[in-house]
Amino acid sequence: MKTTVLTILFALCCIGQLIAVDVPRSEYPRPQFERESWINLNGEWDYTFDFVNTGKEKKYHQATSFDGKIIVPFCPESKLSGVEHKDFINHIWYHRTIDIPQTWDKKQILLNFGAVYYTSEIYIDGKFAGRHFGGSSSFSIDITPYVKPGAQHHLVVKASSDLRSGMQGAGKQSLRVYSAGCNYTRTTGIWQTVWMEAVDYKGLKSAQVLTDIDQSQIVIHPQFYNEGKAMLKVLLKDGKKIVATSEVPASNQTIIVLPVKKAKLWSPASPFLYDLTYQVVDEEGNVIDEVNSYVGMRKVHVEGNKIYLNNKPYYQRLVLDQGFYPDGIWTAPSDEALRKDIELSMEAGFNGARLHQKVFEERYYYWADKLGYITWGEAPSWGMDANSVEVARNFIVEWSELVRRDRNHPSLLIWTPMNEEWWPDRVQYPRFTADLYDLTKSLDPTRPINDASGGVHIKTDIWTMHNYEQDPAKLKEVIYKDGKFFQTPNNIQGAAGRNLGFNDPLITDEYNFPVYDGKMPFLIDEVGGIKWVKDQDKVNAGGSWGYGEAPKSEKEFIERLKGQIRVILELKDQVWGYCYTQLTDVEQEQNGIFYYDRTPKFDLKLIHEIFSQHPEESDK
């Protein structure tokens, strides 16, 4: 018995060493569904490029090493990867060895990827173990049949990307060789944490958590890897105090209802989170799986032309955050960097962010939940042909995975599947967009949907527009004039480009795209974008990019910014929120409140005074 205990302790120490602080991004990547027994696979891997896709013929999947070295989870385009290859990468192969602890015997062994752009194939000792389509969603591969506890194995990952095909969402990755305008350095391959974990065969696979503040209860829909003779015990805690508990059969048909007396609600002003523990218990009373989580009780809904949070009108003062980093591109250099971006935004006076053309990692949402920071979830839809049936097939599958992954986060208020779709056809696009809306509602009926931010709306809960008019007086007239709202220009495929203008559609064909009717919230979710750089000569030489003509002085910048926000707030009866472009500069696009290195451009107290203003009726 003593020998067994020592063996277990030794194995746990080994696991602890594998997740030591010298491993990049060593923190647990999924804080809302956390297990104790896991191994972080970040760090140095081997790699090789495969530009002409002959790697399979060359038996790369059977490799035991490659010549190149790369630091995972940073993409090969980034400085932190140690590679910095900036040109297009169609295919890349990764390799490393993995050691399976003996203590994982008789467990299901899962290989988890935070994200790999875009498609991936997984091999263990040369044997195909699984594949995944989609560059932003997390996925797991059950490698139990391919590994042996106590043994070492070779793990090979092939990642492929074809950005210029139009068949995959690129987000803000440049489709040109170099960054240009509002498109930046690409991300290929592994760009989020890779880890292994051991789970009992009857373990908990997922749990959808719905909070009902009107009836003061939490409803949980659990799913298990395999159903059997086991029970699920759920504990809801406020600190160390157990607030509610339930024990039910471990069945996929089970619905758990936890009454919460005197519930503490989550809001930006008071971001309270309950701790939530799941325990799967076998017939002998042993805990065979335990997952630690948390939940924030809050409600978001649309009523008339306003968005409500916890049954009160809530005005959103958002900033556009594209989630790029100078040294990591799509990958934050540290967990602290994720938190710091949120804190900088709040210091500047914003109460949330529209997370733009990138799926942010789960730890970002964790910090948003903890700090009380509103977010909008968005897919990197730019670069894909939204009129293509194949694109619809690819996108719908990945979008489903994203909604399931992030739907339990209280900070996430709005779903935005697509951005600025301005070139619709009259058949596929309306169907695709409406299907996306219906699919999202079926997966998450609790949140409003912004179907195509600033673009051609088809089926949506809120109406959004983008406009970068720099003159405040003109901006006000552009948004709303003579009782009419501006509609984003739509360029219909197969017809001359026509501006729908104010809400008098000029298209007289059989099918007219919808226009705003005043019966839902109207938000300007891209505005501002005022360019400012330290070096005015760089502006004059065209070395920076932004919207409109750059101000000549700091005073001119501040006055323009004040004016833009003032006129939007004056339209509070028509416009229920805004999103300012943007939080930080990104490469050559230099219109952030902060520089790319996160240093402030102006006195933050002054900036905070501007962006912290709110109209009446708004929850402070």
Can you say where each PLM-predicted feature lies in the sequence?
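Accessory beta-strand-rich segments of carbohydrate-active enzymes
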Residues: 31-32, 47-50, 85, 89-203, ...
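Beta-strand-rich binding/interaction modules
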Residues: 122-124, 217-249, 254-256, 276
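Substrate-binding cleft/loops of secretory-pathway carbohydrate-active enzymes
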Residues: 429, 453-481, 532, 536, ...
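Substrate-binding clefts and catalytic carboxylate motifs of secreted carbohydrate-active enzymes
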Residues: 33-57, 116, 182, 186-189, ...
